[in-house]
């Protein structure tokens, strides 16, 4: 990965990430997720996905709530975010399938295989989309930038701005705000 992060400095001890704007959005997403390890128990991942959904679906309200709720619903799509997938989240996905919804489980890249095994155990591996958070972030940056004729880095900065606003609205630990340079 190209770039670095510093979780001990920055304004209010925010997550400070120095990125090379010439590297790929996958690299940026990996650095953001890596920087959250040990600091948040899924809070960063949750609000990052919420920020992307808000940015992508401007005409559809994306409720902002504490990360413990753990999911977003947009139309028939239910996005579950988990830094460490468990049977509990897979049971929620199974409930979504039974209700005729399409669950998407977003997990860190290194947790994809574990999530797949748990989905098989629940019998929903064919109905559930398991996507790495890193791929979700990167693909949305690429697609939004392409649709709007913008550069990838400016779209990332917009998403981070939305993320910080959403985080400040519902969380008490503002050290989880992200500063990208």
Question: What residue ranges belong to the model's regions?
Answer:
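Interdomain/boundary linker segments immediately adjacent to catalytic/signaling cores
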Residues: 1-40
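Catalytic core segments in nucleotide and nucleic-acid processing enzymes
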Residues: 32-181
């Amino acid at each position: 990965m190209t770039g670095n992060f510093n979780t001990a400095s920055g304004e209010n001890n925010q997550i400070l990430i120095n990125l090379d704007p010439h590297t790929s959005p996958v690299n940026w997403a990996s650095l953001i997720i890596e920087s959250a390890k040990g600091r948040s128990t899924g809070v960063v991942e949750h609000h990052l996905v919420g920020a992307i959904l808000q940015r992508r679906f401007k005409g559809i309200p994306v409720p902002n709530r504490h990360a413990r709720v753990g999911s977003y619903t947009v139309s028939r799509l239910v996005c579950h975010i988990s830094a460490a997938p468990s049977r509990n989240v897979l049971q929620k996905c199974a409930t979504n399938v039974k209700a005729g919804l399409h669950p998407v489980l977003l997990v860190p890249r290194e947790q994809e295989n574990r999530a797949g095994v748990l989905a098989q155990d629940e019998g929903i591996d064919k109905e559930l989309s398991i996507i790495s958070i890193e791929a979700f972030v990167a693909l949305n940056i690429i697609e939004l930038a392409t649709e709007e004729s913008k550069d990838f880095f400016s779209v990332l900065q917009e998403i981070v701005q939305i993320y910080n606003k959403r985080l400040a609205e519902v969380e008490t630990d503002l050290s989880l705000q992200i500063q990208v340079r």
